[in-house]
Amino acid sequence: MKISLLDYGLVDEGKTSAEAVRETLELAQLADELGFHRFWVSEHHNVPALSISAPEVVIPYLASHTKNIHIGSGGIMGLHYSPYKVAEIMSTLEGLFPGRMDIGLGNSPGTPLVGRNLQSLYSKEQYALWLEKLQHYLNEARHKGVVVPEVATVPEQLLLGMGGQSIESAATLGLSFVYGVFPYIPQDPVELAKSLSKKYRSTFKSGPHSKPSNFVLAVFVVIADTSEEAEEMAKPLDLWMLGKQDFSEFHTFPTRKDVETYELTQRDREKIASNRSRLIVGNPREVFEQMETLRAVSNPDELLFIPLVGSIEKRKRSVELLAEL
C-alpha cells in the first residue's frame, strides 16, 4: 500500500518560520529516500506556529530538491482563489516537474479575518461550482490556449474532506478523495471511514482521464520507539488541538514545559479526551494495530500520515518508523 506524508511546517520553540520551512525540506528529502509516495504541505493563515501559508511557493522548492516523490498541497483552500489562477499555477508546476505534482484541494473558508483579508470570491456553498470551473480550465480549456503554459498532463487532483459536498464532488468528477480523521470532528472515525469509503466507491464516475477511484485515509499519528515516549510526544499536541484563539494561543508549537505549566479546565480535559479518540498514538506495533482497525473497515488505497510532533529530530524519527510499518 502506498504511504504518504502531510507536513504542517511546525515552528518549534527557538526557531523562526524560515527555519521551519527549511526543516520541511529535510522531511521531504527523507521521505523521498525512504520511498514514500507523496509529500504534501498544508495551507494555514494567521497561525503563528505553522509556517506554510503559500504552498504553491513551497512546492517547487521541495520538488527541486527531491528526486522521485510526488509533491503537492494538502491542501490549497480553493475558495480563497480564482479557479483560473489555480489552474495556471498547477499547469506551470506540472510543466516544470511533469508527473510529480499533486493538487490537494480543501474548502475551508478559514477564520473571518482570513476571509476578509484574502477577499474570498466564493462561499462554501459554491464549492461544487468552483471545482467545476477548475475542471474546465484543466481539461476542456487546456488545449485552447486559455490556460498557459499548455502541458501534456495535468496534476493529480485529490479532494480533502470529511464527507458532504467534498465526497460527492470527488465521486461525480472522478477525482481522488482524502478522508481526514481529524481530532476535532465529533463523528466516530471508524464508522465514518466505513460509510464514506462505501459511498465514494459506489457513486464514483470515471473522469476525463479515466483514472480509477482512489480513497485515501489521512490520520494524525504520534509514533515513537516506545509507548512512553509516544505518550510524552502526544501531550503537546493535546494542548495544540484545544485550538484556542483560532490556534493562535501558542506562537510556536507547544513544548513539554508548556504542558507542565498549562492550567487545564475541566472543559479542556474533556476536549483532550475526545480528541485522543481520533489520534493514533503509540509504538510501531500499537500504531499498526490501530491503523488496522481503520483499514479493515474502509480498505483505503493509500495512507496519508500527519506526524504533528515537536522537534525536527522527532519528526524525522517518526517518518523512519512509519516507513517500517
Question: How does the language model describe each region?
Answer:
Residues 1-65:
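N-terminal beta1-alpha1-beta2 module of alpha/beta enzyme domains
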